[in-house]
From Swiss-Prot:
CDD domains: IHF_A. It comes from Salmonella typhimurium (strain LT2 / SGSC1412 / ATCC 700720). It comes from the Bacteria. Disulfide bonds: none annotated. Belongs to the bacterial histone-like protein family. Heterodimer of an alpha and a beta chain. Residues 49-75 are annotated as: Disordered. This is Integration host factor subunit alpha. SMART domains: BHL. The keyword Transcription regulation applies.
Length: 99
């Protein structure tokens, strides 16, 4: 099961007493700010959680798995996430939930 933006909004509604509309807008604005920063080439550091970084990947040779034909894989920029130590520790020590 995955945590969704709708579930995050519902949590803010329940815990902070925000209106459903304000809770949804807060979640949307939070993620929009992360997107904006990454689009502008900035690193995003969330203390106690982790860092979103941009990494430029060079062009490299590849192969079409169906035909075996050599094809170039174009250079591109990718987003990476590195979890912080606090997040790593909490995940390692968490009890797995049954689905």
């Amino acid at each position: 099961m995955a945590l969704t933006k709708a579930e995050m909004s519902e949590y803010l509604f329940d815990k902070l007493g925000l209106s459903k509309r304000d809770a949804k807008e807060l979640v949307e604005l939070f993620f929009e700010e992360i997107r904006r920063a990454l689009e502008n080439g900035e690193q995003v550091k969330l203390s106690g959680f982790g860092n979103f970084d941009l990494r430029d990947k060079n062009q490299r040779p590849g192969r079409n798995p169906k035909t075996g034909e050599d094809i170039p894989i174009t250079a591109r920029r990718v987003v990476t996430f590195r979890p912080g130590q606090k997040l790593k520790s909490r995940v390692e020590n968490a009890s797995p939930k049954e689905e």
